[in-house]
Amino acid sequence: MLIKLLLLDEPASSLDLGGREDLLKRIEAFASDPLAPATVIVTHHIEEIPAGTTHALLLKEGKVIAQGVIESVITDANLSVAYGLPISVQSQNGRFFARAT
């Protein structure tokens, strides 16, 4: 049987920093394989979005705030709406980081 979808619900939850980074590198390597299934990752922490992720869906209270190409979804404005406070987003080497401003 061919797997077409891999759904990971908060896979880095309860991991320390080293464990999280190891997991993300493994997910990045797995997802970069052309034969890998489509991968959906659910997270509340943008730091846990693996490099190479192409699309995102941002929800607040079950409603879509933004969807599409990840760079157009993970923005200061969208995350500020999602979290209800001013957020500054930065990216480095394909990874995202946020902080309250």
Model-inferred region functions:
Residues 6-10:
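Catalytic Walker B motif of ABC-type/P-loop ATPase nucleotide-binding domains
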Residues 16:
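ABC-family nucleotide-binding domains
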Residues 20-35:
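Helical segment within the ABC ATPase nucleotide-binding domain
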Residues 43-44:
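H-loop/switch region of ABC-family ATPase nucleotide-binding domains
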Residues 49-51:
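A short, surface-exposed alpha-helical micro-motif characterized by mixed small hydrophobic
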Residues 67-68:
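ABC ATPase "signature
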Residues 80-101:
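ABC ATPase nucleotide-binding domains
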